[in-house]
Amino acid sequence: MEIDILIDAPHWDALDLCGLAQSACVATLTDLSLDPDDFALSILACDDARIATLNTQFRGKPTPTNVLSWPSEDRAPETPGAMPHLSDLAAELGDLALAFETCAREAADGGKPLPDHISHLIVHGLLHCLGFDHETDADADLMERLETRILARLGVPDPY
């Protein structure tokens, strides 16, 4: 899988974000019976200030968040809890942004290793790029089951 990572905050240098992203993305695509070699994703590794600006611009929420995603195309199913349409996907799946301070704070508050939490958020963001969401209870249940299963492949405990 081709992953283009832009490090926009120095805190990220302490983590192997490239390795975490590669493992998380390959596990996600493989779990969904997709060939990781067919796809690409871009990741912006930023700070809370940058992601708050993006969150304001794209979601109208002037606060930091852990991860934002921008799918390259709309793949969401019409039926709540249904699988998105995963055939004929564009090679470029979309873009993610991760905020270091928010991710680190959430990991510490949850007693989770930061790399495990980052892996979870990459899986979560990639699933959004593939058309999954958590707008309804049925959608959230499907997405959480997938995340838990994919993270188990990576040796990451159930985040829920």
From Swiss-Prot:
Highest taxon above the source species: Bacteria
Cofactor: how and how many bound: Binds 1 zinc ion.
EC number annotated for this UniProt entry: 3.1.-.-
Gene Ontology terms: biological process: rRNA processing
GN (gene name): ybeY
Job of this protein: Single strand-specific metallo-endoribonuclease involved in late-stage 70S ribosome quality control and in maturation of the 3' terminus of the 16S rRNA.
Cysteines engaged in disulfide bonds, as pairs: none
UniProt-listed HAMAP family: Endoribonucl_YbeY
Lineage, top ranks: Bacteria, Pseudomonadati, Pseudomonadota, Alphaproteobacteria, Rhodobacterales
Protein name (record): Endoribonuclease YbeY
Keywords tagged on the record: Cytoplasm, Endonuclease, Hydrolase, Metal-binding, Nuclease, Ribosome biogenesis, rRNA processing, Zinc
A GO CC annotation given for this chain: cytoplasm
Originating species: Jannaschia sp. (strain CCS1)
Subcellular localization, as worded in the UniProt entry: Cytoplasm
